[in-house]
UniProtKB/Swiss-Prot annotation:
Modified residues (Phosphothreonine): T256, T369
GO molecular function: ATP binding; protein kinase activity; protein serine kinase activity; protein serine/threonine kinase activity; protein serine/threonine/tyrosine kinase activity
Protein name: Serine/threonine-protein kinase Sgk1
Residues annotated as domain AGC-kinase C-terminal: 356-431
Species annotation: Mus musculus
Amino acid sequence: MTVKAEAARSTLTYSRMRGMVAILIAFMKQRRMGLNDFIQKIASNTYACKHAEVQSILKMSHPQEPELMNANPSPPPSPSQQINLGPSSNPHAKPSDFHFLKVIGKGSFGKVLLARHKAEEVFYAVKVLQKKAILKKKEEKHIMSERNVLLKNVKHPFLVGLHFSFQTADKLYFVLDYINGGELFYHLQRERCFLEPRARFYAAEIASALGYLHSLNIVYRDLKPENILLDSQGHIVLTDFGLCKENIEHNGTTSTFCGTPEYLAPEVLHKQPYDRTVDWWCLGAVLYEMLYGLPPFYSRNTAEMYDNILNKPLQLKPNITNSARHLLEGLLQKDRTKRLGAKDDFMEIKSHIFFSLINWDDLINKKITPPFNPNVSGPSDLRHFDPEFTEEPVPSSIGRSPDSILVTASVKEAAEAFLGFSYAPPVDSFL
């Protein structure tokens, strides 16, 4: 009986281990999902929902965050509730202006495609979103916020630029800078971790981008390796501004529960008001991952990972310099009022000894040679994109002209909900 019981336990352990590995692989593939999708997936797992820790942290049995959980159903938006950002230029753009060549990314509401403008012969990354999917999850506010932030980003070298936007009856189109050096996530997967000088360079460019957003009273809220791109020379480009919060002044706070699980700051998990320092926590988490290969409090068990973020002391292995250790301890301070950046925001980060070798004027002017060159041969070089995306066929509907779309009641509702989305740069802009 003892031998049989032991054998049964061994079999169970092996099976469970295989399951955990499969879950981890799937989880890593789905890190690109927003927190909404991630939590909905957890909530649909009966086994996970039984854990008191999961119920406590996510409050699954008593949803109180309609913006996160979509717990309170509401009727379709009436005309008075429709989003209207005011007058904007009409670019007269349409899908048939482009050759859509390859899928280079995917998200909750659509795809990102490499496209060539037929008249200009210029390559762009075109983010195409399904209006009905956005409306179904009540995410119009975040999409419009992303558009607003993109309009402010055009003057900063480490933030992706919006060239113009337009819409059809059923889709939204963001025409963005095409960046083909790969996601930081992709390079971390291949190399596991970076040497400290390389991590310092990336952290400095990321901090510069975050500092610029903060100067515009914008909190980014979703810094992670998947949202950090490398351009063709190896410089950082921050992208995906859907979770940005606008109008947060120096001492201002917000309380929406959002972000990506591995990078959530303690105050966000506690559902307390939080401020700009949430971005400095995320910078610390990304820097830690660049140096060590995993986020600082990572666990395969989500509830355990959240408990680690809230309660576990930061553990730093000895293979980094004292200045890197000091910076990580300052950024990953659980008390946001004591966190590095709490007093003087970006200026505190900029003046830290870890960055003493960085000439910030040269950095912002891209006069510092990046430590890694993606060595892309041109716009059609897709070696740094996941084949999972690039091998997917381009949907024919993406390039379809508006006249060919059947305008149903739901399509009309979707079209009206995004009045003011279209944008064209002024004639005297850099474009």
